[in-house]
Swiss-Prot record:
Acetylation keyword on record: yes
Composition-biased stretches (Basic and acidic residues): 21-34, 386-395, 486-500
Superkingdom field: Eukaryota
Domain Ubiquitin-like: from-to ranges: 705-788
Main location: nucleus
InterPro entries: SF3A1, SF3A1_dom, SF3As1_ubi, Surp, SWAP/Surp_sf, Ubiquitin-like_dom, Ubiquitin-like_domsf
Name of the protein in question: Splicing factor 3A subunit 1
Organism for this UniProt entry: Mus musculus (Mouse)
Cellular component per GO, a single term: U2-type prespliceosome
Positions of region (Required and sufficient for nuclear import): 678-700
Length: 791
């Protein structure tokens, strides 16, 4: 055998071992997410960030871009997920890994790491998607109701241990002995401050009540409590479910709280980003004085307030209220349209005209198409139910009444539109002001002056008639002075006689009134008569009663001389012709003209302040107890009483021509009136009255009294029309009773009444017998003036 060169068997090439190593590397490369060869142009993130990027890319590749958007929304504030932003430097690496995972090239990383670390890493890798999925599931499951509260947990308040023991011990006894024990304890310890927690207004009362409930459940447990405890002891899973639900509820509450805080934070940031001082002037509009623009008309404060109320009503009630307001405005427009033709005829009332115009308009208009039926009305509320006893269900139902056009009534005081339901209250409030009559008259006058064009037909007719009466030069045949009617100059008003009431307070006023009514010619005639230069007219200057002209005059009866008292001095009587009445000499006070006086019953000199009641003239026999004077007696100057004409004496003398230069004579006072005068001719005073007791003895029984009421047209609230009121009263009644009856008959308050009987102002506190009132007595009623002197 030929031996050849011995060649040694070469050792196994290292490739075998090397080939083994790449296999391990390939196996390990399946776990290593990093590529075998780095890609040029991509920035690789650090290892801690690369792990998050790779895991996110794997989930995005499997779940789609919706999962990426969800992660971006949930982790918007997490800086570790900034690689999701396109501007981030690691975003290119993230996109590269997503494409690799979609193509199946990329694998999970597994570098030379201990096995324990690899297991932990795998656990964390598997834990992340589970967390994300758990979050997605938890967002869908929301706890509906809160878990039941803990029954045996009550946080003790911050009080001392002794007080806490007192509260707990009291709660135990109350739970054991019942509420009756609590009531007795409260009554017994109501003054003990340590038991103040038993009062409901105390701060520890709620804690005490909670303890009582807990002790009661322990001492007297409910029915299902034992079965529940037994079930939970046998099945701990149920307790865990309750705990899990409570935890989920706590997490849900926390998420809601965080969400609210985030919304508030976003809103705060948004407000903080606004620059409130940064603005841009886009355009400046200047309006010239003569420029005309399409602007709304100016509004008054009243219209502005009405618009604000309408807006508030619309915001509060919505569109329904606006519809009602539009309906009301349409009704008002119809009323305005109806009032325009109604002005042509003023003889009818406004309501009749409105009704007539409505009928005419309805007759002219085409009947509208049938509308949809109205929905049934709501059931009446209890306060609107009206029970009718005479209701007959079988009777024919009346036609539905037409809608009342007078829902709003015009107030006669203010002229405003007032609802009919509130008119009574409006009138009551409006009439509280006593000046509403003046305001109403003033407004009517102003309205008439403004609306003269629309005067009614009767006013125009009366105005033309008055114009024709006073312009006879145009409308008449007989011409008079312009502005005067035919026969107006002949008709003269009767002179109003000025009468002094006897009070010093009215002296100046009466004097002025007397001077205003006397002309210059009358003053000259009075001076001539006083000087005796002109024969006196006996028919005018005569004082006292006189007989009518058609009755033949008779001589005085001889029996009248017997009435002279024996104590009086002898008086010589001078016979006089019966046809000539005695003239009167009057005293004229300086600066006061002589006025013709009405005939008076008697002449008596009275002190100032007395009152002379005018009496009608009564025909009787001539007097003989008068002191004669020469016919040419000069005027006698008397001391200055009130500035009126004062008759001094009767001068019975035959008519003889007066002597121009008579000798002065001393003043002669008239004698007192005789007792034979009738009682109506004598002026009474309280001193001359008969005592009340004596008058009651002489007169018994009730008397009939007549009260003469004045005619005062300006006092419309009182019935003062000049009528006479007759009352029958006993003599013992006071004057105040008469005033009460006058108030009942006329409405005049007793405080405004002033009663006068035979020249005496009677007082309320005195009786009728005090003033000697007999049957047929006449009492004059007057108005008590305010602010004047007490009368």
């Amino acid at each position: 055998m030929q031996a050849g060169p011995v060649q040694a068997v070469p050792p196994p090439p290292p490739v075998a071992t090397e080939s083994k190593q790449p296999i391990e590397e390939e196996a390990s490369s399946k776990e290593d997410p990093t590529p075998s060869k780095p890609v040029v142009g991509i920035i690789y993130p650090p290892p801690e960030v690369r792990n998050i990027v790779d895991k996110t890319a794997s989930f995005v590749a499997r779940n789609g871009p919706e999962f990426e958007a969800r992660i971006r929304q949930n982790e918007i504030n997490n800086p570790k997920f900034n690689f999701l932003n396109p501007n981030d430097p690691y975003h290119a690496y993230y996109r590269h890994k997503v494409s690799e995972f979609k193509e199946g090239k990329a694998q999970e990383p597994s570098a030379a790491i201990p096995k324990v670390m690899q297991q932990q890493q795998q656990a964390t890798q598997q834990q992340l998607p589970q967390k994300v999925q758990a979050q997605v599931i938890q967002e869908t499951i929301v706890p509906k109701e809160p878990p039941p509260e803990f029954e045996f947990i009550a946080d003790p308040p911050s009080i001392s241990a002794f007080d806490l023991d007192v509260v707990k011990l009291t709660a135990q006894f109350v739970a054991r002995n019942g509420r009756q024990f609590l009531t007795q304890l409260m009554q017994k310890e109501q003054r003990n401050y340590q038991f103040d927690f038993l009062r409901p207004q105390h701060s520890l009362f709620n804690y005490f009540t909670k303890l009582v409930e807990q002790y009661t459940k322990i001492l007297i447990p409910p029915k299902g409590l034992f079965s529940k405890l037994k079930k939970e002891a046998e099945n701990p899973r149920e307790v865990l479910d309750q705990v899990c639900y409570r935890v989920e509820w706590a997490k849900f509450q926390e998420r809601e709280r965080k969400k609210e805080e985030e919304e508030k934070e976003k809103e705060r940031v948004a407000y903080a980003q606004i620059d409130w001082h940064d603005f841009v002037v886009v355009e400046t509009v200047d309006f010239q004085p003569n420029e005309q623009g399409n602007f709304p008309p100016p509004t008054t404060p009243e219209e502005l307030g009405a618009r604000i109320l309408i807006q508030e009503r619309y915001e509060k009630f919505g569109e329904s209220e606006e519809v009602e307001m539009e309906v009301e405005s349409d009704e008002e427009d119809q009323e305005k349209a109806e009032e325009t033709p109604s002005q042509l005829d003023q003889d009818t009332q406004v309501q009749d005209m409105d009704e007539g115009s409505d009928d005419e308009e309805e007759g002219q208009k085409v009947p509208p198409p049938p509308e949809t039926p109205m929905p049934p009305p709501l059931p009446p509320t209890p306060d609107q139910v009206i029970v009718r006893k005479d209701y007959d269900p079988k009777a024919s139902k009346p036609l539905p009444p037409a809608p009342a056009p007078d829902e709003y009534l015009v107030s006669p005081i203010t002229g405003e539109k007032i609802p009919a339901s509130k008119m009574q209250e409006h009138m009551r409030i409006g009439l509280l002001d006593p000046r509403w009559l003046e305001q109403r008259d003033r407004s009517i006058r102003e309205k008439q002056s403004d609306d003269e064009v629309y005067a009614p037909g009767l006013d125009i007719e009366s105005s033309l008639k008055q114009l024709a009466e006073r312009r006879t030069d145009i409308f008449g045949v007989e011409e008079t002075a312009i502005g005067k009617k035919i026969g107006e100059e002949e008709i003269q008003k009767p002179e109003e006689k000025v009468t002094w009431d006897g009070h010093s307070g009215s002296m100046a006023r009466t004097q002025q009134a007397a001077q205003a009514n006397i002309t210059l010619q009358e003053q000259i005639e009075a001076i001539h008569k006083a000087k005796g230069l002109v024969p006196e007219d006996d028919t005018k200057e005569k004082i006292g009663p006189s007989k009518p002209n058609e009755i033949p005059q008779q001589p005085p009866p001889p029996s009248s001389a017997t009435n002279i008292p024996s104590s009086a001095p002898p008086i010589t009587s001078v016979p006089r012709p019966p046809a000539m009445p005695p003239p009167v000499r009057t005293t004229v006070v300086s600066a006061v003209p002589v006025m013709p006086r009405p005939p008076m019953a008697s002449v008596v000199r009275l002190p100032p302040g007395s009152v002379i009641a005018p009496m009608p003239p009564i025909i009787h026999a001539p007097r003989i107890n008068v002191v004669p004077m020469p016919p040419a007696a000069p005027p006698i100057m008397a001391p200055r009483p009130p500035p009126m004409i004062v008759p001094t004496a009767f001068v019975p003398a035959p008519p003889v021509a007066p002597v121009p230069a008579p000798a002065p004579m001393p003043p002669v006072h008239p004698p007192p009136p005789m007792e034979d005068e009738p009682p109506s001719k004598k002026l009474k005073t309280e001193d001359s009255l008969m005592p009340e007791e004596e008058f009651l003895r002489r007169n018994k029984g009730p008397v009939s009294i007549k009260v003469q009421v004045p005619n005062m047209q300006d006092k419309t609230e009182w019935k003062l029309n000049g009528q006479g009121l007759v009352f029958t009263l006993p003599l013992t009644d006071q004057v105040s009773v008469i005033k009460v009856k006058i108030h009942e008959a006329t409405g005049m308050p007793a405080g405004k009444q002033k009663l006068q009987y035979e020249g005496i102002f009677i007082k309320d506190s005195n009786s009728l017998a005090y003033y000697n009132m007999a049957s047929g007595a006449v009492i004059h009623l007057a108005l008590k003036e305010r602010g004047g002197r007490k009368k």
